[in-house]
C-alpha cells in the first residue's frame, strides 16, 4: 500500500544520508 511505499522510500533516503555522513566523517578523520 501507500504507507509501505512511503516507508520504503524513507528507508532508502535514510540509508543514502547515513552513507553520506559516514563518507564525510571518513574524510575528516583520514583525509579524502
UniProtKB/Swiss-Prot annotation:
Compartments reported by the entry: Secreted
Protein's job: Antibacterial activity against Gram-positive bacterium S.aureus and Gram-negative bacterium E.coli. Has activity against C.albicans.
GO cellular component terms attached to this protein's record: extracellular region
Any Pfam family hit: Antimicrobial_2
Domain of life: Eukaryota
Tissue: Expressed by the skin glands.
Secreted in keyword set: yes
Disulfide feature: 27-32
Name by which UniProt lists this protein: Ranatuerin-2Lb
Assigned keywords, A-Z: Amphibian defense peptide, Antibiotic, Antimicrobial, Disulfide bond, Fungicide, Secreted
InterPro entries: Antimicrobial_frog_2
Organism: Rana luteiventris
Protein family membership: Belongs to the frog skin active peptide (FSAP) family. Ranatuerin subfamily.
Keyword Repressor: no
GO BP: any one term: defense response to bacterium
Amino acid at each position: 500500500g501507500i504507507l509501505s511505499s512511503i516507508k520504503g522510500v524513507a528507508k532508502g533516503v535514510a540509508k543514502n544520508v547515513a552513507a553520506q555522513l559516514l563518507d564525510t566523517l571518513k574524510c575528516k578523520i583520514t583525509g579524502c
